[in-house]
């Protein structure tokens, strides 16, 4: 039953001569439905990136309602220079130990005080 949907997710790739095919999917978790959990676990490893949303943040009107520590991309080293990757990882380490709401509020504060991504990621 999962073979057809998994083949669709596997279709995401770079297209010769430029461009790419991007597949975006959502999964509702923590529903207390065993079937939802099974489906989520089946597809979890097929993505290249995961953006984990947090209901608590949305309820508090903190946007984007993203759990920074639980969100990320695989193979980040292919997307930026080693220096940028290192700076991103350092920022993530600073946020990882915080509750999701405090982590996002901290990140939003840093973003407000920065004029650019380069400034945000500059070593302290």
Language-model features, listed with the residues they occupy:
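P-loop NTPase catalytic core
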Residues: 1-124
